[in-house]
């Protein structure tokens, strides 16, 4: 820990400039994140994390609890700052929250006093944008998410899965370049989660947004991802990146028994078990 306490933080601006030349939509280079305990002892959460995601790619991030997955997502979202290294989105340094990044959390976090339509258009109103300019695309997202006819319903009138679909549409309402998802289906039962995986795949195939999804489910990661990134226990590092060669659209009943799925699941499990 003494090394962490005396670590020299490199200049983020210079690093970000190098990232902009790589061609990835979003990239992290040399990311270090340090937290302090109540007693002031430094805790190394992320250590020299390098990660790149191409435009339109769906990447799933898996790792043991406490390895820094959510911390990395917060850094990608501009909700926190790294102690070393840099992030780049579409060639520009990430130095704070941006309309170019949509975020979906484990809980839908819908405002209960607003209707579905009011919830999904909230980012537009808060950001000072004209709803009229985005109304047609947002209504198309509602159609893709199978929420047509529910625009005037309130969150309490929706199932958990429907609430998460509303949260996804809300995150996409400002047409972000990047969608970050932190265990969005972790609180759902197994069958609903499987259905939501299929729904998310359908929405993604229609929108082709760049997605980074955090999950503890190996099956979910393989079903949804073009690539699965495996992290180590804390301090979080990238252990391996595995390409998923399964054809799309994927159907759970067919995919889970596919030899490629079985092989990848076995390999990911071995990496997680150390």
Which stretches of residues belong to each language-model region?
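Helix-to-loop junction immediately C-terminal to a conserved catalytic motif
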Residues: 77
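Conserved signature/switch motifs of ABC ATPase nucleotide-binding domains
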Residues: 153-156, 174
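Short coil-to-helix segment of the ABC ATPase nucleotide-binding domain corresponding to the Q-loop/switch region
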Residues: 114-122
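Signature (C-motif/LSGGQ) region and adjacent switch/coupling loops
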Residues: 42, 97, 117, 143, ...
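Hydrophobic anchor residue at the start of the ABC signature
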Residues: 168
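Conserved ABC ATPase "signature" region
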Residues: 125, 132-150, 202
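Conserved ABC transporter NBD signature motif
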Residues: 85-97
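The feature captures the beta-strand-to-loop junction immediately N-terminal to the Walker
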Residues: 62-64
């Amino acid at each position: 820990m003494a090394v962490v306490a005396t670590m020299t933080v490199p200049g983020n601006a210079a690093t970000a400039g190098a990232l902009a030349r790589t061609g990835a939509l979003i990239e992290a280079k040399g990311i270090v994140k340090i937290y302090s305990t109540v007693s002031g002892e430094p805790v190394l959460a992320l250590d020299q994390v390098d990660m790149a995601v191409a435009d339109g790619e769906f990447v799933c991030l898996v790792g043991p609890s406490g390895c820094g997955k959510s911390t990395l997502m917060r850094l990608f979202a501009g909700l926190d700052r790294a102690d070393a290294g840099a992030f780049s989105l579409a060639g520009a340094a990430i130095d704070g929250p941006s309309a170019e990044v949509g975020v979906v959390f484990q809980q839908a976090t819908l405002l209960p006093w607003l209707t579905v339509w009011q919830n999904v258009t909230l980012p537009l109103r808060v950001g000072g944008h004209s709803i009229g300019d985005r109304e047609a695309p947002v209504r198309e997202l509602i159609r893709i998410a199978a929420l047509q006819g529910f625009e005037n319903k309130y969150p309490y009138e929706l199932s958990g899965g429907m609430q998460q679909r509303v949260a996804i549409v809300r995150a996409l309402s400002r047409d972000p370049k990047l969608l970050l998802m932190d265990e969005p289906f972790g609180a759902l039962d197994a069958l609903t989660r499987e259905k939501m995986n299929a729904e998310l795949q359908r929405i993604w195939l229609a929108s082709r947004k760049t997605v980074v999804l955090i999950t503890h489910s190996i099956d979910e990661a393989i079903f949804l991802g073009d690539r699965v990134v495996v992290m180590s226990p804390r301090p979080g590092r990238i252990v391996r990146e595995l390409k998923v060669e399964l054809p799309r659209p994927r159907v759970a009943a067919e995919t889970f028994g596919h030899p490629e799925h079985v092989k990848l699941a076995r390999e990911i499990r071995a990496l997680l078990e150390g």
